[in-house]
Design a protein with these regions (language model features):
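Active-site-proximal loop/helix segment associated with metal-binding centers of metalloenzymes
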Residues: 124-187
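Short, solvent-exposed aromatic-acidic interface loops
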Residues: 250-259
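Core catalytic region of metal-dependent phosphoesterases/phosphodiesterases
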Residues: 5-10, 19-114
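Beta-strand-turn-beta hairpins that frame and shape the catalytic cleft
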Residues: 3-12, 112-120, 216-221
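Conserved beta-sheet core of the metallophosphoesterase superfamily
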Residues: 100-107, 120, 125, 131-137, ...
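Active-site neighborhood of phospho(di)ester-bond hydrolases with catalytic His/Asp-centered motifs
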Residues: 13-15, 44-48, 81-88, 121-122, ...
């Protein structure tokens, strides 16, 4: 007798891959994930910072961006529904990218309703309310007028500006570490509680903080996704899988279930 085939995974959740040409092993691991795992799920949710940066959809013509978009399109062509929530690195992803990959762009946060279960999906950066400087920056660059003006600049100029922003961000994070204030780069507990209350949900899935873990109590569940880096040792990365029975399983970057 042949063993029964496994139940198809309802959804996979990943974030914070920070894909870039300078990280070829991480890129290869992501492409492997798409070909061997994501293609067998019903839905794939990309919860932000999939790219290290995104200067605009006109960059889709670059070989690297084209490779990633083509790989995602293969997954959607196989019948997997793709969903995208912007991160702080790739919030300029727009309709052209969505059409190329057949991904649906979602608001942050988004509620995923499956049967009686409600799941809050978010990149997670807006929950880091203790980082006041970042929240001010986030508010500014998410405005339609700012994005329109920025995208009107030549692509090369946009990339130069983004490179400068990345350097400033790295220095900002270093300063916070020097001040022993790592807590401001994590989610604010009150902001998380307010989100649970506002959405009448009990499960939250997010990334951004690079602090993977499961925070479970009697009333709520908060799952933090891992960032990815396979180019350095030890390798890290992975995803969360939602099963038909509502359970959530965590997998590491090599595809081993670790929960």
């Amino acid at each position: 007798m042949q063993p029964s085939s496994p139940t198809r995974t309802v959804a996979l959740f990943i974030s914070d891959l920070h894909l870039q040409p300078e990280m070829p092993e991480t890129t290869a691991a992501f492409l492997h994930f798409l070909q061997r795992h994501a293609i067998h799920a019903k839905q794939l949710y990309l919860l932000g910072d999939i790219f290290e940066y995104w200067a605009g959809d006109d960059d889709l013509t670059s070989p690297f961006a084209h490779t990633i978009a083509t790989a995602l399109r293969r997954v959607s062509d196989a019948g997997v529904a793709l969903f995208w929530i912007a991160g702080n690195r790739d919030f300029l992803v727009g309709d052209v990218f969505a059409k190329a990959t057949q991904a649906t762009l979602l608001e942050d946060p988004t509620i995923l309703q499956l049967g009686e279960n409600r799941y809050i999906l978010s990149h997670g950066d807006q929950l880091c309310t203790d980082d006041v400087a970042y929240q001010h920056f986030r508010t500014q660059v998410r405005q339609s007028a700012w994005k329109t003006a920025f995208l009107a600049r030549p692509l090369a100029e946009r990339k130069e500006i983004i490179a400068g922003m990345r350097m400033q961000s790295q220095q900002h994070q270093k300063n916070q570490l020097d001040k022993h204030a790592e807590r401001i780069m994590d989610v604010n507990p009150a902001a998380v509680t307010a989100l649970f209350s506002r959405t009448a949900s009990t499960t939250l899935i997010h990334g951004h903080t690079h602090r993977p873990g499961s925070h479970l109590n009697e009333t709520t569940r908060r799952y933090v996704l891992s960032d990815w880096d396979v180019d350095h040792h030890p390798a890290r990365g992975g995803w969360l899988a939602l099963q038909q029975d509502g359970s959530l399983l965590r997998y590491n970057v090599t595809g081993d279930c670790i929960t």
